[in-house]
Regions:
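Bacterial N-terminal signal peptides
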Residues: 1-8
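Secreted, luminal/periplasmic, and some membrane-associated catalytic domains
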Residues: 26, 62, 107-108, 219-305
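Loop/turn elements at helix/coil->beta-strand transitions in domains of secreted/extracellular proteins
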Residues: 26-31, 57-61, 129-135, 179-185, ...
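Solvent-exposed loop/turn segments at secondary-structure junctions
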Residues: 37-40, 60-61, 67-71, 85-86, ...
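Second-shell loop/turn segments in exported
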Residues: 37-42, 65-66, 109-114, 124, ...
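Short, structured active-site-proximal loop/turn typified by the sulfatase FGly-forming signature C/S-X-P-X-R
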Residues: 41-88
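His/Asp/Glu-rich, glycine-adjacent segments
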Residues: 83-200, 284, 294, 300
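A long, amphipathic alpha-helix that forms part
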Residues: 163-175, 192-233
Length: 305
C-alpha cells in the first residue's frame, strides 16, 4: 500500500508525560494513516486525488501481502509491532485465552483495553519510552497501557465519529506548541472496509467510501501545508487487507455435516475458522483435521502447532 470519546491522558510512566523530552521536539513527525480494507488497486480504480498526491510526491508499494489471518486486528497490530500474530498474540478479531478462560473480542471494551492480550512493543510505546509525545485517533492497541505505557493522547473507538471530526483533531494536535506537539500520530478510517463488507467490492457504496476517505486525507494534507509543516511531517498510508467479491457454492463447507461439534468451540469469519476443544484431546484433533481435509477440496485444516 501507500508509502477507538476522547481520553486526553498523560502517558503512564515511563511515557513522555505529554511533553517532548529536551531536544525531542524538533525533527520529523509521522502521521500513520490506516484505511481498513483498502485494496492495493483501489488507487487506480477510483478517483483518489489526495492519495495520488502522496504517491506522486513519495513512494508507494504496488501490492501487499497481509499476515495470516488477513483480518483487521491481527494485521493492524502487526503493523504496529513488526511481529506476526503468533508472536504478538492478537491472532483473530475474537479468540480465547484458554489459560485465563477468557475471550478477546474487538467489540468488548474490557478486552480491548486489557494490556495482557497484547504482546510485543508497538511503535507508540517505543516512542513514549524515548520521551516523544504520541497521539492516536484509533489504532489497534492504543486503548491499552501496553507495558504500562499509553499514547499521551488517545480516543476510544467510536464508529459514529465522522472521519472529518477525526481529521479535525489531528490538525489540532499539529497546531500545538512544539513541546506538546506529537511526534507520532495514528489515524484510522474503517469506512472502506465496512462498505466492502456490506455492499461488496465494486459497489457504488464502496466508491463513495473511498471518495470520502480520500477527501478527508486531502483536507489533512492541505492543513499540514497551511501550518507550515510540509517539510517536517511525513504521511504514511497503510491498509490491513483488501477485499474481493467471491461466490462459489461448492466452496462452502458445513462443519456439522462432517464432524461432531460436541465439546468444540468454533470461531468462523470470512475465509477462516478456528476450532477449539473444550477439553484437549490430541487424537481427536488429528481426526478432525483429517476428516476436514478428506472432505473439502477448497481449503485445508492444520493443527495449531
Amino acid at each position: 500500500m501507500l508509502a477507538f470519546g476522547l481520553q486526553a491522558l498523560a502517558g503512564a510512566a515511563p511515557g513522555s508525560g505529554g511533553r517532548n523530552a529536551p531536544g525531542a521536539a524538533d525533527g520529523p513527525r509521522l502521521i500513520l494513516i490506516s484505511i481498513d480494507g483498502f485494496r492495493w488497486d483501489y488507487l487506480s480504480i477510483y478517483p483518489t486525488p489526495a492519495l495520488r498526491r502522496i504517491a506522486e510526491s513519495g513512494v508507494r508499494a504496488e501490492s501487499m501481502r497481509p499476515v495470516y489471518p488477513s483480518l483487521t486486528f491481527p494485521n493492524h497490530y502487526s503493523i504496529a509491532t513488526g511481529l506476526y500474530p503468533a508472536e504478538h498474540g492478537i491472532v483473530h478479531n475474537h479468540f480465547p485465552d484458554e489459560a485465563r478462560n477468557r475471550w478477546y473480542h474487538l467489540h468488548d471494551r474490557s478486552s480491548v483495553e486489557d494490556a495482557r492480550w497484547y504482546g510485543g512493543e508497538p511503535v507508540w510505546v517505543t516512542a513514549e519510552k524515548n520521551g516523544l509525545v504520541t497521539a492516536a485517533y484509533y489504532f489497534v492497541g492504543t486503548e491499552a497501557a501496553i507495558g504500562g505505557v499509553s499514547p499521551s493522547h488517545w480516543h476510544s473507538f467510536d464508529a459514529s465519529v465522522p472521519g472529518g471530526d477525526r481529521v479535525t483533531q489531528v490538525i489540532d494536535w499539529l497546531a500545538w506548541p512544539e513541546a506538546r506537539r506529537p511526534r507520532l500520530i495514528t489515524l484510522y478510517f474503517e469506512h472502506v472496509d465496512r462498505a466492502g463488507h456490506d455492499f461488496g467490492s465494486g459497489s457504488p457504496e464502496l466508491a463513495a467510501a473511498v471518495a470520502q476517505v480520500d477527501a478527508n486525507i486531502g483536507r489533512l494534507l492541505d492543513a499540514i501545508e497551511d501550518l507550515g509543516l510540509g517539510d517536517e511531517v511525513y504521511v504514511l498510508v497503510v491498509s490491513d487487507h483488501g477485499q474481493a467479491s467471491y461466490v462459489d457454492p461448492e466452496a462452502t463447507f458445513v462443519l456439522r455435516d462432517h464432524i461432531d461439534l460436541a465439546g468444540l468451540d468454533v470461531v468462523a469469519g470470512g475465509a477462516y475458522a478456528w476450532i477449539y476443544q473444550e477439553e484437549p484431546d490430541p487424537e481427536r484433533a488429528r481426526a478432525i483435521r483429517d476428516a476436514i481435509n478428506a472432505a473439502w477440496a477448497h481449503g485445508r485444516a492444520v493443527l495449531r502447532d
